[in-house]
UniProtKB/Swiss-Prot annotation:
NCBIfam families: fliE. Disulfide bonds: none annotated. PANTHER family: FLAGELLAR HOOK-BASAL BODY COMPLEX PROTEIN FLIE (PTHR34653:SF1), PTHR34653. It comes from Buchnera aphidicola subsp. Baizongia pistaciae (strain Bp). Belongs to the FliE family. The gene is fliE. This is Flagellar hook-basal body complex protein FliE.
Amino acid sequence: MKIQNINNNLYSDDVIPYLSTEKITHPKNFYENFTNALKKTSANERNIFDKINNSQIDESNSSLNDIMVDLQKISISIQFLVQVKNKLVESYQEIMNMQI
C-alpha cells in the first residue's frame, strides 16, 4: 500500500471558507490557561451568587430559569476543572513511578 502526500489544495479558502491563513494566537503555556480558567470560573461563580442574592431581594430582576441554567454552567465548569486537576495528578504520579 502506497502512502500519498497530502494535497495542500484540499483545504483551500474557496473549498472551506472558515479555514483561514491568519495567525492564531495561542496562550503561552498550560499554567496560564489553567489559571485563566480558574479565574473565569471563580468570577462566574461570584456573579451567579450575586444574581441569586439580588433575585431574593428584588423578585422581578432575574428569572428562576436563568439562575438554574447559570448554576448548571458553573457546575460543569467546576467538574471540568476537577477532571483536569485529577488528570494532572495522575500524570504526575505516573511520571514519578517511572524507573530511570
